[in-house]
Amino acid sequence: MAGRILDWRKELERWLRPFLERLGHKTRRRMCPVYIWGLIGPGDRKSIQPMAERIALGAYDQLHHFVSAGVWDVAPVETELLIQADKLVGGRDAVLVIDDTAVLKKGTHSVGVAPQYCSALGKIANCQTLVSLTLAHGEVPVMAAMRLFLPESWTDDRARLKRAGVPVEYRAARTKPEVALAEIDRVIAAGVRFGCIVADAGYGLSARFRQGLTARKLSWAVGIPRHVKVYPVDVQMIRPVARRGRPPQRIPDTLSVAAEDVLTTAKWQNISWRTGTKGKLRARFAAVRVRVADGSPQRIKDKTHQHLPGEQAWLIGEHRASGERKYYLANLPAKTDLRALAATIKARWVCEQAHQQLKEELGLDHFEGRSWQGLHRHALMTMIAYAFLQYRRLATARSKNLPK
């Protein structure tokens, strides 16, 4: 056992070299592997004190300084993580999954903590929310980025932001989709390769998020609530006959309709998109081409304000065996078949696996500090640890497939 532990520690040190070069000072280069050893190694608690007691007696002050108090820039290390993630799973067949994960907290002093929706509990709870970006190929995810979302109770309180050490560039109020778009820009700037962005309805509901992805010339497939409005793909803009005065504005020749209503007459098919541990995963799917009602708002005829037709997209419905129904939009090409659409929208499940492992095995939610800097450094170390584990997983799989 001791020999195996020593072997993976040596392997970790070799793999970490590009990261250590970005850290600069020799003390930081020495503490980084120690911290990551502590995250990966045995032990129920992955906060600084118990890790120091297990792996580096007397190193508490140095580990604390490395993560919470030391003056060093995380940006170069974050960029290196993106580079390594791309090497592991990047490519045209990869997806970039946008999601968020909650870290439960007590009190009011930890940066970003507030009563807000906690996905793990399915209800409002006192927690921090980290917007996450996961690069994945098939069933192999690599957590590539995390950024803390700040609720209004924080962005409206300058003194509170300053006490928690929130950098000036992150103090303005931003929605989770806006945080995600900024992180996507960082991912793109690092040269990370992926074919499609996928996200749940928490992000897909945002027209600005979808439009932001399209403006960046990205393919996307996102969940939406059932009431999101769409138009027929062949909707036409017409100019009503004016009785007097200025010519009226052009309006759609039909009204927009809720997504769930559009699919009631669609052709539904049983589709298998992946083989899981218990066999093929199946559900009933239907898809039609539509124009999304996310253009400018305008009063149409004698109706209330509606949004004008936006870009063309696929509207996709899913009927699960449990009776649950889900709806999605995707700007994938019109020639995309139903199975490919289903496989793309279901690709986001891998981020849930990554979130679970980051918390249960690597201690993402064990950080006990209160500062912005400390939280993001700890999260970064857990992501690097996770990337190393995925590196070993892929290396092991390759070695098993080598000819004997």
What does each model-found stretch correspond to?
Residues 23-39, 43-108, 115, 221, ...:
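Electropositive nucleic-acid engagement tracts
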Residues 10-13, 122, 136-165, 169-173, ...:
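An anionic, glycine-rich sequence signature occurring as long contiguous blocks
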Residues 68-152, 157-158, 162-163, 297-304:
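Active-site-proximal, Lys/Arg-enriched surface segment
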Residues 1-24:
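Basic, low-complexity segments
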Residues 160-240:
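Domain-level cores of phosphate- or acyl-group-handling catalytic modules
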Residues 51, 92-106, 133, 196-205, ...:
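Short, conserved catalytic/metal-binding motifs centered on acidic residues
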Residues 330, 336-345, 360-377, 396-399:
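Short, solvent-exposed helix-loop connector elements
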Residues 389-404:
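Conserved nucleotidyltransferase catalytic core and NTase-mimicking acidic/glycine-rich helix/loop elements
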